[in-house]
Amino acid sequence: MFTMKKSLLLLFFLGTINLSLCEQERNAEEERRDDDEMDVEVEKRFLSTALKVAANVVPTLFCKITKKC
């Protein structure tokens, strides 16, 4: 029974170390990848915001210019 507990503890310890190393590697990979993805996300957010503002402003400007409201 004692040997079984020892081996289970050893397996648990090695598994924990393995998961920790995998997590560190995954985080490092995400950091490298995040820089490019963040730029794309910022561009997407900027374009959608610009389109929303344009959709609200253009009809108002058109109305004021043509005076057909």
From Swiss-Prot:
GO biological process: defense response to bacterium; defense response to fungus; killing of cells of another organism
GO cellular component: extracellular region
Disulfide bonds: 63-69
Pfam families the UniProt entry points to: Antimicrobial_1, FSAP_sig_propep
Keyword Signal: yes
Summary of the tissues where the protein is detected: Expressed by the skin glands.
Signal peptide (UniProt feature, chain positions): 1-22
Keywords: Amphibian defense peptide, Antibiotic, Antimicrobial, Cleavage on pair of basic residues, Cytolysis, Disulfide bond, Fungicide, Hemolysis, Secreted, Signal
Keyword field contains rRNA-binding: no
InterPro entries per UniProt: Antimicrobial_frog_1, Frog_antimicrobial_propeptide
Locations listed in the record: Secreted
Propeptide residue intervals: 23-43
Location (main, coarse): secreted
Described purpose of this protein according to its UniProt entry: Antimicrobial peptide. Active against Gram-positive bacteria R.rhodochrous X15 and B.licheniformis X39 and against Gram-negative bacterium E.coli ATCC 25922. Has antifungal activity against a slime mold isolate. Has weak hemolytic activity against human erythrocytes.
Family: Belongs to the frog skin active peptide (FSAP) family. Brevinin subfamily.
Protein name per UniProt: Brevinin-1CG1
Organism: Amolops chunganensis
